[in-house]
């Protein structure tokens, strides 16, 4: 089936063919010796410096024998000045008259060699002595323009288009690129903090025979050679604990996790988390470590602990506030749920108009009350501690109250950011907790945990006292970049598949029997 081209796309393909006709390959294979970035040239400007730059040509002002254009590389933009007789020293002026003026388009990649100078108005620029075509774009970019007053016109702002075509979004919206650069810096800072304490970065399986470590619905796939079902991991917790059993004192992992659940502004089916486990520590130590780590990250990435999140200013300066879960519910509802059974909790939910269903046990009911009535009130970083034991099947019972657990969740701007335990290391207690989860599954709770027999076997060999913590990288990036949607901090967020023209090949048709 013929591809439907716009008028601009047709013209660009004609230009591409014209380049080849005059002996210029629009997609050359040879290395181009870039030695400078535009950002550095402008921030550390030295007049008369010889430079080699490459990037997209963005904007062009043709003025007879001389022209100005903007060159955009990975670090920013700089003005370039092109004189016909400078780049065409002989009688043949094709490179300027035909290639630069007629056959190059907005968005094409070019390479230039030249010398830095300041224009009469003081703008850092590059006087071009050599021009090379590096890559021809056959599809036009959105023409986003900014006027002298800083107003943006024809902006590329439609969220669905931006998320589907992130490659375009990154080119024309500099703030988007800045968000992802900060995301990378956040992860680097976190990694440096943890390795600086001597902890080992590890990798654990993504495909797992038992989806454990969290209460969530998994994605299921099938391994043909083994003829068995496998699950995309919902968490990496149980494998990291196996490594603690194996003798490591501190491990951490930046892990992709997958949960087959709904999507909204704070949830994507595929997301990134960091989990860490350290021996001979408890959840109180982990609270201190978590707040120290977040304060360090803020200073490394932003230079301040104060962050604007929507209308709120949030301060990540340690120490953070501590509030028990039962205390939080009492503070915001006036009801003390301590010691209540399931029937009493259902009455509380009815009174507070918290929606619940018959599949929910005590833990889920308490979680729903907290989520509906309390969570959104915690704007400043706050550790919610001491969760009821029914909510935390992998967590050690509280040393002072066996009905509670040594667990905290860190709330920021009304959302959970991190979750941590004094880890349960009693294999007999752990088996009983898993069996309670099976009962919940029998009642219809599709987020109840599976029994992982191999993990129980590992615990039976002995696991030292350990504290573990997991933190959502996507959500942390949202907070530190001031974004209110997780789609803004994931390069390619999950979306409904795009409908292409009929006649497009079915990807499954190209799979062998063993790969379907």
Where are these regions (language model features)?
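Class II aminoacyl-tRNA synthetase catalytic cores and aaRS-like
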Residues: 1-516
């Amino acid at each position: 089936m013929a591809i439907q081209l716009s008028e601009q796309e047709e013209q660009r393909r004609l230009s591409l063919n014209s380049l080849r006709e005059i002996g210029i390959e629009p997609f050359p294979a040879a290395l181009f010796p870039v030695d400078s970035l535009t950002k550095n040239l402008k921030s550390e400007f030295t007049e008369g410096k010889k430079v080699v730059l490459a990037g997209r040509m963005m904007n062009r002002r043709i003025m007879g024998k001389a022209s100005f254009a903007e060159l955009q590389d990975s670090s920013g933009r700089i003005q370039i000045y092109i004189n016909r007789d400078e780049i065409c020293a002989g009688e043949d002026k094709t490179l300027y008259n035909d290639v630069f003026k007629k056959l190059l388009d907005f968005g094409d990649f070019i390479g230039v060699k030249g010398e830095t100078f300041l224009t009469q108005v003081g703008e850092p620029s590059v006087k071009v002595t050599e021009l090379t075509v590096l890559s021809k774009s056959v599809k036009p970019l959105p023409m986003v323009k900014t006027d002298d007053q800083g107003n943006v016109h024809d902006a590329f702002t439609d969220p669905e288009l931006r998320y589907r075509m992130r490659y375009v979004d990154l080119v024309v919206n500099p703030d988007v690129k800045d968000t992802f650069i900060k995301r990378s810096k956040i992860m680097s800072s976190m990694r440096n903090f943890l390795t600086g304490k001597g902890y080992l970065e590890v990798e654990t399986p993504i495909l797992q025979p038992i989806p454990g470590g969290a209460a969530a619905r998994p994605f299921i796939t099938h391994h043909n050679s083994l003829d068995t079902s496998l699950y995309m991991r919902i968490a990496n917790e149980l494998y990291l604990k196996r490594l603690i059993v194996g003798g490591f004192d501190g491990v951490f992992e930046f892990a992709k996790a997958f949960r087959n659940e709904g999507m909204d502004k704070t949830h994507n089916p595929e997301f990134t988390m960091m989990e860490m486990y350290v021996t001979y520590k408890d959840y109180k130590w982990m609270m201190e470590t978590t707040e120290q780590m977040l304060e360090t990250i803020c200073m490394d990435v932003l230079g301040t602990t104060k962050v604007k999140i929507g209308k709120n200013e949030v301060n990540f300066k340690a120490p953070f506030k501590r509030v028990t879960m039962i205390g939080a519910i009492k503070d915001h509802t006036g009801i003390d749920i301590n010691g209540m059974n399931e029937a009493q909790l259902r009455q509380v939910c009815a009174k507070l108009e918290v929606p619940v269903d018959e599949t929910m046990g005590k833990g889920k009911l308490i979680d729903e009350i907290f989520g509906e009535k309390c969570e959104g009130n915690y704007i400043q970083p706050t550790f919610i501690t001491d969760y009821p034991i029914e909510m935390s099947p992998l967590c050690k019972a509280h040393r002072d109250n066996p009905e509670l657990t040594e667990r905290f969740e860190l709330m920021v701007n009304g959302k959970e950011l991190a979750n941590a335990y004094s880890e349960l290391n009693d294999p007999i207690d752990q088996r009983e907790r898993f069996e309670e989860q099976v009962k919940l599954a029998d009642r219809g709770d599709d987020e109840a945990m599976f029994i992982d027999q191999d993990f129980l076997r590992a615990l039976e060999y002995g696991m030292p006292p350990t504290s573990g913590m997991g933190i959502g990288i996507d959500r942390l990036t949202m907070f530190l970049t001031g974004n209110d949607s997780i789609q803004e901090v994931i390069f390619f967020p999950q979306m409904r598949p795009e409908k292409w023209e009929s006649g497009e090949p079915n990807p499954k048709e190209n799979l062998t029997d063993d790969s379907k």
